Amino acid sequence: MDASQRLNAAASFILQSPPGEINDVISDLRTIVNDDDALQEGIQSSLEKYNQEQFVCVTVPGHEHQVIVSSAGLIPESGRFLDPRTKTSFVFDHLTLTASEPEPVEVDAESEPFRSALEESTLKYLADYFQEGVGSVFALNPNTFVIQIVANKYNPQNFWSGRWRSEYTIDLEKGEISGKAFVNVHYYEQGNVQLQTVYTPTFSLPTGLTPSSAPKILAIIGEKEGEHERALSDAYTDLGETTFKSLRRALPLTRQKLDWDKVLGYKLGAELAANRGAFGTA
C-alpha cells in the first residue's frame, strides 16, 4: 500500500470513528502513515465532515456554554460557525476542537423571536431529559428552523461509549417537522460490538403557531423520542432472547450450557442494561 492509499484509508477510518474515540483513531493512524504533515492534510476534509455530522460541541469564546458545530451553523462565505444564542461567529479548528476569533453577528430580526423561543424550550427539554446534553437552534429563514441535540456518554474504564444525535427541521409553511435521530454505541471489552440506529419521524405541526407555541413543539419531539427509546429497549431485549442465542453453539468452549433465560445477567447485557437511558431520553 503506497502513501496515497494509506491516506485514503486513513480518511475513511476517520469517518467511521466511534463516539469519543477519534483521538485514539488519529493516534493509531499516525503510526500507520508515519508522516504527521501528510496525515493532517490528508484527513482534514474528513475531520470537517465527521465533526459536523457528529455534532461536535465547543465552548463559545467568552462564554461558558457550548454550541453544536454543524452544517446548519456554518457561514458559507467565511467558513466560520455561528452560535445563535449569543449571536457570535467563530473560527473552529477541526483538529484541536477549539474555537477562536469570536465576532458579533447580525441575525435576521424576523426569525429571531421564534428561534429564541424554540431555543428556550429546547434547553428546558435538555435539562429535563438529557445528562450533559447540548442543544442548538438555527434559523435557516423566517419559516424554517433546525433544532439539534447531542448527548455523549464515554466510559473507557468499562470499555464502552455512546452518542445520541437528533435533528428536527421545522417548516412553518408546510406545517410539519421532519426529524432524524441517531444512536451509536461501541462496546469493546475483549471484542467489538457496535450498535447504530437511525430513526426518521415526520409529523404535523399544530396550526396557528407563534413563539409561545415552542413548548408544544418540544413536547411533540419528546413524545417521539420517548417512543423511539422504548422501541430500542424492546429490540435490545429481543436480541438477548432470540438473536444472540441463535448465534451461539449449544456448548461453548467451557463445555457448560449458557442459561439464555438469564442472558441479561451476563456482563455485556449487564453493562448495556445499566446504562440504558444514560442519554436521558424520556
What are these regions (language model features)?
Residues 1-77:
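Alpha-helical protein-protein interaction scaffolds
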Residues 9-13, 25-28, 42, 46, ...:
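Charge-rich, solvent-exposed alpha-helical interaction surfaces
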Residues 14, 43-51, 57, 118, ...:
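Generic hydrophobic, helix-prone segments enriched in Leu/Val/Ile
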Residues 24-28, 80, 146-148, 180:
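Ordered hydrophobic segments in well-structured contexts
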Residues 48, 52, 58-124:
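Membrane-inserting hydrophobic helices used for pore formation or membrane fusion
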Residues 49, 53-58, 194, 198-200, ...:
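C-terminal/domain-edge helix-coil "capping" segments
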Residues 116, 120, 124, 128, ...:
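Surface-exposed short loop/turn segments
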